[in-house]
From Swiss-Prot:
NCBIfam families: PRK03996.1. CDD domains: proteasome_alpha_type_4 (cd03752). SMART domains: Proteasome_A_N (SM00948). The 26S proteasome consists of a 20S proteasome core and two 19S regulatory subunits. The 20S proteasome core is composed of 28 subunits that are arranged in four stacked rings, resulting in a barrel-shaped structure. The two end rings are each formed by seven alpha subunits, and the two central rings are each formed by seven beta subunits. The catalytic chamber with the active sites is on the inside of the barrel. GO terms for biological process: ubiquitin-dependent protein catabolic process. This is Proteasome subunit alpha type-4. Keywords: Cytoplasm, Nucleus, Proteasome. Belongs to the peptidase T1A family. GO terms for cellular component: cytoplasm; nucleus; proteasome core complex, alpha-subunit complex. PROSITE patterns: PROTEASOME_ALPHA_1 (PS00388), PROTEASOME_ALPHA_2 (PS51475).
Amino acid sequence: MSRRYDSRTTIFSPEGRLYQVEYAMEAIGNAGSAIGISSKDGVVLVGEKKVTSKLLQTSTSSEKMYKIDDHVACAVAGIMSDANILINTARVQAQRYTFSYQEPMPVEQLVQSLCDTKQGYTQYGGLPPFGVSFLFAGWDKNFGFQLFMSDPSGNYAGWKAAAIGANNQAAQSMLKQDYKDDITREEAVQLALKVLSKTMDSTSLTSEKLELAEVFLSNGKVKYQACSPEKLNSMLVKSGLTQPSAEES
């Protein structure tokens, strides 16, 4: 039945479904997991890296975490070439807003603008939708710390804690069970690592397979900080999710 209606993004099935958009969401389900948790003093993003190699230049490459502006960052799951286009679009929009109004772009306004672009690609004939989902973490003076999730359809929503990528439903269920409204940033890191350790396909959790980033306030200014492999390893040991190396012990 679907073959009659999935050749173009502009054709609805009799059930009102856009199959090309659903196929894009299937691609995200095969990508590495990413988890975002909003706390009272920051937002934490943790992602599972699928590409791991000793030859990879980790200092210049990132698979899951990207800084958009000084006050906004994102985690991605899906087709990375699609993600790069949208991330660059978001960066340009944020800089244009800052240039025009001399203040940072509100987080939700930036997310909505990018999602308008994503939604447009579900209406153009001959163009596939973007096969990528995002978790946006940010802070602005109006609403403080915020976490948004968007999917290939262009839909977005604000969340206290959210998961995208492989096994996202299991991760979402665990977050719903363990999340507290008064959670701190340190507790959010521990929770995100715990959830990811139980939903990843890999049997062992190491810094080579993870990326972690935080958005928080430091001396009254918003700061984006990507966690180094060494610090991430110490966090995993502290959480009891991995054994200390011979050098550390």
